[in-house]
Amino acid sequence: MPVDQSFNAPLSEVDPEIAAVLEQELGRQRGTLEMIASENFVPRAVLQSQGSVLTNKYAEGYPGRRYYGGCEFVDVAEQLAIDRAKSLFGAEFANVQPHSGATANAAVLAAIAQPGDTILGLELAHGGHLTHGMKLNFSGKLYDAAAYGVDPDTFLIDMDVVREKALEHRPQVIIAGWSAYPRHLDFAAFRSIADEVGAKLWVDMAHFAGLVAAGVHPSPVPYADVVSSTVHKTLAGPRSGVILSRDTALAKKLNSAVFPGQQGGPLMHVIAAKATAFKIAATEEFADRQRRTIQGAQILAERLVAADSTEAGVSVLTGGTDVHLVLADLRNSPIDGKQAEDALHEVGITVNRNSVPFDPRPPMVTSGVRIGTSALATRGFGETEFTEVADIIAETLKPGSDLAALRARVLTLTDGFPLYEGLTQ
């Protein structure tokens, strides 16, 4: 009996509703400026790897040790991803199976801590992550979570305070990492504190992994017992996670924590896409993109601390940035984070409202916006374009701005930098 007609039919025929969604989303991405700090545009080669026949293959286990037959080719794909990740970051161990950053983080904690152990991470409201000890998250339910914060005057992490917290709580795990913090972390100081209290040091570099890969950000790998990351964000790979370590003695625990501890079958099509992304991340072209990413963020920060922005009540947390994002502080502005997000959306710039440390407003409103430059650097933006984007953002955040005129300026930029040429869905 032949395969039924729908098997080989195109998406537009089988499911026109979803086909329309894909077309509309492609149009949105092409016609707007994507500046959510956790988003990026993946290369077409990554899309091709992920949208492949590898989606059909079940492969519980690890290369050479599977619980299913027919894994000879997916073994090659996973081993390529492992070897490329290790080479890219200078690690001795890599697990490329985590479905997401959160899954990777859950596996890390399962490998290096026991339920009820104390963990110490950056406070969520000060730029930390849900998986670093938020009470409603698994990390806050399974573990005794303590937190360090930022200085109320500088908004920087004070390592003396981190040490005091570590001595007070005696955690089994110290977490260095963030979701909204615009400066480098002092990995050597974190290592010293962890050694002093007998803790494991886990670095979550989900946001800055691409910068590390390009050599434009300090690497945590030589200092941490374990490093986790997403593969999207600055790495511009598929939405997924990875775990790294220089300690081969932890390899068995980390592998077991991922499978069977957190997951069953790995997503082999996603793992193949990770391999492709890691290969691209080792190129000079990728490194140039990361340099432009940081340059763009610093141009934006400088524009938002200019006199006219300051007069409009806008400031920049920590006064600048070392990474791919800027945190605009609107506590003295007549508009809040939600209103700023909406205004920027209207002109065609996508950001997310974000709480700032000691924020007087609720989390669904906030007093800040988090603005990232990775996707625009991927699109090809350089100094000239980032200067224009920064001015558009600064003008949008002023009360009474001509949003229609600003939208026209955005369209000039998007028209000049086509995205996914030739792609229809």
Curated annotation (Swiss-Prot):
Q: Which pathway does the UniProt entry assign to this protein?
A: One-carbon metabolism; tetrahydrofolate interconversion; Amino-acid biosynthesis; glycine biosynthesis; glycine from L-serine: step 1/1
Give the reactions, separated by semicolons, that this protein catalyses.
(6R)-5,10-methylene-5,6,7,8-tetrahydrofolate + glycine + H2O = (6S)-5,6,7,8-tetrahydrofolate + L-serine
Superkingdom of source:
Bacteria
Q: What is its EC number?
A: 2.1.2.1
Binding annotation for (6S)-5,6,7,8-tetrahydrofolate: L124, G128, H129, L130
CC cofactor: pyridoxal 5'-phosphate
Q: Residues at site: Plays an important role in substrate specificity?
A: H232
**GO molecular function terms listed in the Swiss-Prot or TrEMBL record:** glycine hydroxymethyltransferase activity; pyridoxal phosphate binding
InterPro entries given for it?
A: PyrdxlP-dep_Trfase, PyrdxlP-dep_Trfase_major, PyrdxlP-dep_Trfase_small, Ser_HO-MeTrfase, Ser_HO-MeTrfase-like, Ser_HO-MeTrfase_PLP_BS, SHMT-like_dom
Q: Where in the cell is it found?
A: Cytoplasm
Q: Which Pfam families match?
A: SHMT (PF00464)
Main location group = cytoplasm
| Similarity section | Belongs to the SHMT family.
Described purpose of this protein according to its UniProt entry: Catalyzes the reversible interconversion of serine and glycine with tetrahydrofolate (THF) serving as the one-carbon carrier. This reaction serves as the major source of one-carbon groups required for the biosynthesis of purines, thymidylate, methionine, and other important biomolecules. Also exhibits THF-independent aldolase activity toward beta-hydroxyamino acids, producing glycine and aldehydes, via a retro-aldol mechanism.
Subunit (UniProt) = Homodimer.
- Put simply, this protein is called Serine hydroxymethyltransferase
Question: From what organism does this protein derive?
Answer: Clavibacter sepedonicus
Instruction: Please state the gene responsible for encoding this protein.
Output: glyA
